[in-house]
C-alpha cells in the first residue's frame, strides 16, 4: 500500500512539474510589441485605405517586428530587410503556407491557383508546371517576337499622337501593351478588336485586384464579419467580380478556339489537354476550375504588375528631369540610329536598370507581400511567432528604411552604382517579387518586359508635361488594392525623337 501511495505521489509531482515548466516556458516567450487595439476588432481600424502606409507609420513607433490583432487573428508585420531575411530565408519553411482569405477563396476557386494555394504537393506541381511552360528563360526568349510586334504597334500609335501633339494616358497605354503581350503569350490569341480589348475589361482587372487586396471583416471576425461584409457591400462586390472574371475566362476559351494563331502548343492548350487526360497534380484531378484559377495569376499579375512599374517609372522620370535626360542619353548613345531596340540591346543599359530598381524600391507593385501563415513555431529578432500566426512583409516600408537607404524619399538611381543588389529575392533590401519558396515565379518575364517597354518609350520619344502643368503638379498618390498603381492617371505629351 505504501508503494502505491509513493508512486501516486511521484506521478502527481511529475504532472505538476510538467505544467509548471510549460507555463514557465510560455512566460519566457517574447511577444513582439503591439499597438493598443479595441475590443473585438483589435487593430483593424488602424489599417486605413492603404495598409502598407499605415503599418509603416506604426513600425516607426513599435519597431520592425510588430504584432497586431486583426479581429481574432494574430498578425505579425516585419518592416526591415533583416527581419524580412529571417522570415523569407532563414525560417522560410516554417511560414511558407497561406492563410485563408475570402477574396482569394472566391476568385481562386477555393485556392486552386499558385499565389494563394496552401503549401502542399498540388502547389509544388502546379508552380513547377507554370515555370517550365511559361516563365522559364527559354520560354521568355521564345515570346520575344510577340513583344517586338506589340511594342511596334505601341510606338506607331504614340507616333500618331506625337504628330498631332496629343497627350497620352500612360496608365491605359501601358496596361494595353501588357494585356496584349500576356494574352497572346498565354492564349495565342490577338485580342485587338475583341470584347476583351475594352475599358470594361481593364475595370474588371482592377476590381479583382482590389478584392484580392482588401481586408474583409469575415476574415478576422467570425460570424459577425460576414454580416458586416454584406452590409458594406463587400460580399456583393466579390461575388460580382467572380462572375465577371468567370465570364471572361469562358470568352477567352471561346476566342482561343476560334482565333488561335498558328504555332506550337501554348499554355492554355497544355492545360486543356491535361484536363482532357484527367491529369493529377498533387492529389487533385485537373478540372476547368483549376485552369481558371491558374490563369487568374497569369492574367491579373502578368497584365498589371509590369504596366504599374512602367507607369511609376515614367512618373518619377517626369518628376526628375535630370534622371530622364541621363537615362535617355544612355539609351540613345548605346542604340545609335537603329529603327528598333532588340532584346539584347537592353543588356547594355545599366542606368536604365538602376532606374527600374529605384522605381521598385519606392513603388513596389505589391507593397505588402501576400501574407504567409506559420506552420510551426519560430523566432524573428528573438520574438516568438506561434503556429497559425499570419505574417506580412512590408516591402514598401523596407524601401523607405533610413537604416538601409540614405535619403530614402529621394528618387536617386545612382544609389545602385557599384553594388550587386538585384530583385531576385536574395537581397532583402529590394523585394519587388518577394522571396523564398513563395517568390513570384515570373521574375525574369516581368523584368525583361519592363526593361524592353521603357527602353522603347525613352528611345523613340521625348516626354513633356501638358501645357500649364509643372513638375510639382505631378502627384504620386496610390490607389488601393493587392497591387498599387498610381491613383491619378499619368498624362504626358510625346515628341518624336527619331524618324528612322
From Swiss-Prot:
GO molecular function: heme binding; iron ion binding; monooxygenase activity; oxidoreductase activity, acting on paired donors, with incorporation or reduction of molecular oxygen
A GO CC term attached to the entry: membrane
Binding-site residues, heme: 440
Membrane topology of this protein: Single-pass membrane protein
Membrane-spanning segments: 1-21
InterPro entries from the UniProt entry: Cyt_P450, Cyt_P450_CS, Cyt_P450_E_grp-I, Cyt_P450_sf
Superkingdom to which the source organism belongs: Eukaryota
Chief location of this protein within or outside the cell: membrane
Cofactor(s), names only, from the UniProt record: heme
Family per similarity comment: Belongs to the cytochrome P450 family.
Protein name (record): Cytochrome P450 71B34
Keywords: Heme, Iron, Membrane, Metal-binding, Monooxygenase, Oxidoreductase, Transmembrane, Transmembrane helix
EC number: 1.14.-.-
Record localization: Membrane
Biological source species: Arabidopsis thaliana (Mouse-ear cress)
Pfam families linked: p450
Amino acid at each position: 500500500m505504501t508503494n502505491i501511495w509513493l508512486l501516486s505521489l511521484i506521478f502527481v509531482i511529475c504532472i505538476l512539474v510538467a505544467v509548471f515548466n510549460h507555463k514557465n516556458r510560455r512566460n519566457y516567450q517574447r511577444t513582439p510589441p503591439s499597438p493598443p487595439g479595441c475590443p473585438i476588432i483589435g487593430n483593424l481600424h488602424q489599417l486605413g485605405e492603404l495598409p502598407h502606409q499605415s503599418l509603416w507609420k506604426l513600425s516607426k513607433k513599435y519597431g520592425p517586428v510588430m504584432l497586431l490583432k486583426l479581429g481574432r487573428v494574430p498578425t505579425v508585420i516585419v518592416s526591415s530587410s533583416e527581419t524580412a531575411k529571417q522570415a523569407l530565408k532563414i525560417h522560410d519553411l516554417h511560414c511558407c503556407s497561406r492563410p485563408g482569405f475570402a477574396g482569394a477563396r472566391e476568385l481562386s476557386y477555393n485556392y486552386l491557383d499558385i499565389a494563394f494555394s496552401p503549401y502542399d504537393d498540388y502547389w509544388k506541381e502546379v508552380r513547377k508546371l507554370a515555370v517550365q511552360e511559361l516563365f522559364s528563360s527559354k520560354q521568355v526568349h521564345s515570346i520575344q517576337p510577340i513583344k517586338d510586334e506589340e511594342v511596334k504597334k505601341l510606338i506607331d500609335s504614340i507616333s500618331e499622337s506625337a504628330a498631332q501633339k496629343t497627350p497620352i494616358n500612360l496608365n491605359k497605354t501601358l496596361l494595353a501593351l501588357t494585356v496584349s503581350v500576356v494574352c497572346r503569350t498565354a492564349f495565342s490569341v490577338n485580342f485587338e478588336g475583341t470584347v476583351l480589348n475594352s475599358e470594361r475589361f481593364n475595370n474588371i482587372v482592377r476590381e479583382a485586384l482590389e478584392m484580392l487586396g482588401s481586408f474583409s471583416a469575415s476574415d478576422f471576425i467570425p460570424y459577425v464579419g460576414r454580416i458586416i461584409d454584406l452590409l458594406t457591400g463587400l460580399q456583393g462586390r466579390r461575388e460580382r467580380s467572380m462572375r465577371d472574371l468567370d465570364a471572361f475566362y469562358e470568352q477567352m476559351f471561346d476566342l482561343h478556339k476560334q482565333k488561335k494563331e498558328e504555332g506550337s502548343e501554348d499554355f492554355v492548350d497544355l492545360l486543356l489537354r491535361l484536363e482532357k487526360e484527367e491529369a493529377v497534380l498533387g492529389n487533385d484531378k485537373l478540372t476547368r476550375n483549376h485552369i481558371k484559377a491558374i490563369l487568374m495569376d497569369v492574367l491579373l499579375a502578368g497584365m498589371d504588375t509590369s504596366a504599374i512599374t512602367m507607369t511609376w517609372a515614367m512618373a518619377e522620370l517626369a518628376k526628375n528631369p535630370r534622371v530622364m535626360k541621363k537615362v535617355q542619353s544612355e539609351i540613345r548613345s548605346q542604340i545609335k540610329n537603329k529603327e528598333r531596340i532588340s532584346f539584347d540591346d537592353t543588356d547594355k543599359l545599366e542606368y536604365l536598370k538602376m532606374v527600374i530598381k529605384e522605381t521598385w524600391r519606392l513603388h513596389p507593385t505589391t507593397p505588402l507581400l501576400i501574407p504567409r501563415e506559420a506552420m510551426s513555431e519560430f523566432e524573428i529578432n528573438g520574438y516568438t511567432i506561434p503556429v497559425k500566426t499570419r505574417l506580412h512583409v512590408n516591402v514598401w516600408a523596407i524601401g523607405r528604411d533610413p537604416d538601409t537607404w540614405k535619403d530614402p524619399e529621394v528618387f536617386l538611381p545612382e544609389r545602385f552604382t557599384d553594388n550587386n543588389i538585384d530583385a531576385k529575392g536574395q537581397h532583402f533590401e529590394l523585394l519587388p517579387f518577394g522571396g523564398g519558396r513563395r517568390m513570384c515565379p515570373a521574375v525574369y518575364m516581368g523584368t525583361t518586359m519592363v526593361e524592353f517597354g521603357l527602353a522603347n518609350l525613352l528611345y523613340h520619344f521625348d516626354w513633356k508635361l501638358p501645357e500649364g502643368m509643372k513638375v510639382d503638379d505631378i502627384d504620386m498618390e496610390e490607389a488601393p488594392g493587392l497591387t498599387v498603381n498610381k491613383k491619378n492617371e499619368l498624362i504626358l505629351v510625346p515628341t518624336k525623337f527619331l524618324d528612322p
